Structure formats: C-alpha cells, structure tokens
Amino acid sequence: MAELLLGVNIDHIATLRNARGTDYPDPVQAAFIAEQAGADGITVHLREDRRHITDRDVRILRQTLHTRMNLEMAVTEEMLAIAVETRPHFCCLVPEKRQEVTTEGGLDVAGQRDKMRDACARLAAAGIQVSLFIDADEAQINAAAEVGAPFIEIHTGCYANAETDAEQAKELARIASAATLAARLGLKVNAGHGLTYHNVKAIAALPEMHELNIGHAIIGRAVMTGLKEAVAEMKRLMLEARG
C-alpha cells in the first residue's frame, strides 16, 4: 500500500484575515506551521472573486513552501495564465460558482472533453501536474483518463454529509469503486471535501488513495488546539487507518 499524503488547505486562514480587511492571520505563516506539523503539501483555492486566497498569497507561497503547492482553480483563461506564470507543483481544476459557499460538486469532464484536454495539455507543458476534481462517477473517471490528467480528486462531500450510517456506507462503496476504476486506468487518486476527524479513517483506509486534501476541519480544530496540533492529529488518524 502506497504512502498516504496530507494536503492542508489554508483557505480559511485567509477567510479570517479578510473578514476584517487586515494583514493577519497570514496564510503564508500558517503554511509554514502546517509543514512543520507534518503536512505533505499546501492547498489553496484562488477563486475568481478572491474571497479568501489572493494573488499575493499564491505568489509568496510558491516562493516559500518547503513541500508542494496545490493550486485549486476554475478552468478559465485568467486562472490558466496565473498557473502557467506561477508554476505550482500541482493544479486541481474545479467547478466554480460565484454564489456558492464552497465547491458544491465535481467537474463535468465528460461534457467538456475538449476544454479539459486543452487545459491539461497547457498546464502539463508548464511542468504542472494536473488533477481533476470529480464525483465518484464512472463516466467522469473514464473522461478524466481520456483528457490526459494524471490525477483525479474524488469529491467526498456526499460521503461526508450522509445523514445515516447506511447512506454513508453506500457513498463509501461508491468512492471505493471509483478509486479502483481510476487506478486500473492508470490514474492516481486523491480525495477531499468535507473530511473531518470523525470520518477520515474510512477514506484513508482505501488502498488506492494517494493524498487527502483537508482544510475546514483542520482550521476549525486549530482555533481550539492550535494549528500545529490540529495538523498532526489529522495526519496521525490517516496513518492509523493505513495500519
């Protein structure tokens, strides 16, 4: 079973900063602490409306991170240009709606193959590894393989939001099947969205999982216990699940 990595999403450090229009807390400082605590990478979502992470954050993080930078972004000309200029280690392409609180679902790769193929090729030419944020759906996984993305990130929101044990078990089975299919097609498999200290282990135990990207739960815990301890505890739970 391959090593399981933790990508810590620090968007909500920026949310807190921007709530008062100050220059603190600084996501760059948070990234440094997360790395010290065991994060294998730092994830940020540069949204079109810049509601949390800013261009300045992206630029400085790329220059200062000791691990890997994963830039989440919409598939737009503006964002592709920023990515090509900044050259993060990874880009995760996500759907984006201005009115949403957080990303609500996966990309429709199957319905826009040409657009996704072009984006993947453009980013790959800049030396960036591409991940597509998709639902645990066979058609989307097949399409992801066809357009040339080396990674997918499975949307775990339905699993995380399940209201009953039976519903959660059903969603977990869907994710497990999706991960198996993706691996068979030669894709590396990440996962994220809604994962918490209470539900992460079942996802972490799936042998195909390469990396979990987790943000809100860690930042929420950090308010109570400190960021370093919050990151370390999440990493411990993930590794426990791998035995």
Curated annotation (Swiss-Prot):
Molecular function GO terms recorded: pyridoxine 5'-phosphate synthase activity
InterPro entries: Aldolase_TIM (IPR013785), PyrdxlP_synth_PdxJ (IPR004569), Pyridoxine-5'_phos_synth (IPR036130)
Active site: H45 (proton acceptor), E72 (proton acceptor), H193 (proton donor)
Keywords, ordered alphabetically: Cytoplasm, Pyridoxine biosynthesis, Transferase
Enzyme class: transferase
Residues that, per the record, bind 3-amino-2-oxopropyl phosphate: N9, R20, G194, G215, H216
Location(s), subcellular: Cytoplasm
Site entry: Transition state stabilizer: E153
A GO biological-process term: pyridoxine biosynthetic process
UniProt KW Transferase keyword: yes
Top-level lineage group: Bacteria
Cystine pairings recorded for this chain: none
Recorded metabolic or biological pathway in which this protein acts: Cofactor biosynthesis; pyridoxine 5'-phosphate biosynthesis; pyridoxine 5'-phosphate from D-erythrose 4-phosphate: step 5/5
Residues that coordinate or bind 1-deoxy-D-xylulose 5-phosphate: D11, H12, R47, H52, T102
Record note on quaternary structure: Homooctamer; tetramer of dimers.
NCBIfam families assigned to the protein according to its UniProt record, in alphabetical order: pdxJ (TIGR00559), PRK05265.1-1 (NF003623), PRK05265.1-2 (NF003624), PRK05265.1-3 (NF003625), PRK05265.1-4 (NF003626), PRK05265.1-5 (NF003627)
Family in the record: Belongs to the PNP synthase family.
Role played: Catalyzes the complicated ring closure reaction between the two acyclic compounds 1-deoxy-D-xylulose-5-phosphate (DXP) and 3-amino-2-oxopropyl phosphate (1-amino-acetone-3-phosphate or AAP) to form pyridoxine 5'-phosphate (PNP) and inorganic phosphate.
PANTHER family xrefs: PYRIDOXINE 5'-PHOSPHATE SYNTHASE (PTHR30456:SF0)
Full protein name: Pyridoxine 5'-phosphate synthase
Organism: Salmonella paratyphi A (strain ATCC 9150 / SARB42)
